[in-house]
């Protein structure tokens, strides 16, 4: 066994901690700071009444959507009270190839709902979800992998997904931030009266983080 292989078996606790810090660090940028501020704006402005302001954050795999969501969660942790957990910022992922009913069940489970959804259809599950979000003190929802809800060639299915999303926002009265692939925004075109697109006026794109060699950076400045 060569020395390069064995060196990873003798990593010290201090080295492990440093590796963990590097792997979990959040690297800020003007664009990411702006998106974080936009998310917070949607949350706070929506508390002033009227229709909630929602937001769509798009980016290719590895661009940093999940990391950005984790940073906002870090800034707004769950608070434990005597009779409930206060989840001001609710975070979840759309399951793969999901339909509204599956998505509602997934979100209910992530909020700690323990009752069986057997026999319940999407409208009833959505009503329960909206009520539970309000009970848990949710002020904004960050929902990742949004493309899983629209990965279909059926326009009818897309219209159904758009309608469900609008119903969830209306029943809860809470803003939603959707994270997904760039093509995810097609769902905003599948709403019959275009009101869904009006809810998601704020749309941002995250570009992949790139490291520019110092020599190239110097050339750009010269």
Across the structure, where does each feature detected by a protein language model lie?
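Residue-level preference for the first positions of well-ordered beta-strands
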Residues: 52-56, 89, 140
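Mid-core helix/loop region of P-loop NTP-binding domains shared across ATPases and GTPases
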Residues: 4-14, 36, 99-106, 114-175, ...
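The catalytic "switch" region of P-loop NTPases
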Residues: 150, 163-222
